[in-house]
Amino acid sequence: MSNVLELTIPASTANLGVGFDSIGMALDKFLHLSVKETSGTKWEYIFHDDASKQLPTDETNFIYHVAQQVASKYSVDLPNLCIEMRSDIPLARGLGSSASALVGAIYIANYFGDIQLSKHEVLQLATEIEGHPDNVAPTIYGGLIAGYYNDVSKETSVAHIDIPDVDVIVTIPTYELKTEASRRALPQKLTHSEAVKSSAISNTMICALAQHNYELAGKLMQQDGFHEPYRQHLIAEFDEVKTIAIQHNAYATVISGAGPTILIFSRKENSGELVRSLNSQVVSCHSELVDINISGVKERIVYQ
């Protein structure tokens, strides 16, 4: 029997307000993949959660598509594979489910195609496919990361930031919000003065995080001009959640990725009460505390 590739891939939250398409943080919600060769004539899928059961099992499957794309790039052929999947990352909720699947697909192609990619090369590939590093970088490395993708040179640069000493709360609506729909809400252009203002806010926010000044960082996270003003109307619960967070003296309330999940940076002494208040008052969502993931994707080979 063939060896089994086991992958544990974290979720991620992107933007942190003003860090649009650049800043991301890994979270302890996971996509679990167990992959082995099959004697069948096509790829097989075994889904262990209800959300994953909605995914296609033909060649339009995202993991299949990306894995074959990577294999083609390196001129290798992949065997037919059986993928067992279990995920507690909700789909189309702004928690990086597609980035987790993308990273998983690259690892699958790397192992079964014997490509021998370094982690740096995994990052470059993932960002080239995704178009920006805000989700894939923390998914690969863990922690809080700022990154930039040069679409001319096809080079990704990343910098790690200290893990914030805060409690993180995610408020997850029951409905999906596709990234494509959320991006359609954005303006095509910003004026020079608008771009300078948002860039200055983002720069200062990063420095505040690096200095562990969460009061200032949180204040600046909520002054975004790149995307939040254009997306908040798509999330009916945003204003109510932010009001409750303010009542509990939270540092910041922002959209997680493209939404609709709402991310809160909470003071540790207030986080439990805040989560309970959110769950009792905002009944159309589920709120929970989630740890910041520091390890990134984990790979394990089970020899059979």
Swiss-Prot record:
Q: Name one GO molecular function term.
A: ATP binding
The UniProt family comment states: Belongs to the GHMP kinase family. Homoserine kinase subfamily.
The pathway that the record names for this protein is: Amino-acid biosynthesis; L-threonine biosynthesis; L-threonine from L-aspartate: step 4/5
The protein's name is: Homoserine kinase
Q: Where does ATP bind?
A: P90, L91, A92, R93, G94, L95, G96, S97, S98, A99, S100
Provide the protein's localization. Cytoplasm
Report the superkingdom from the record.
Bacteria
Q: What is this enzyme's catalytic activity, as reactions? A: L-homoserine + ATP = O-phospho-L-homoserine + ADP + H(+)
Under Gene3D superfamilies, the record lists: 3.30.230.10, GHMP kinase, C-terminal domain (3.30.70.890)
This molecule's function is given as: Catalyzes the ATP-dependent phosphorylation of L-homoserine to L-homoserine phosphate.
Gene that codes for this?
thrB
One biological process term from GO is: threonine biosynthetic process
InterPro entries linked: GHMP_kinase_C_dom, GHMP_kinase_C_sf, GHMP_kinase_N_dom, GHMP_knse_ATP-bd_CS, Homoserine_kinase, Ribosomal_Su5_D2-typ_SF, Ribsml_uS5_D2-typ_fold_subgr
Keyword Repeat (UniProt): no
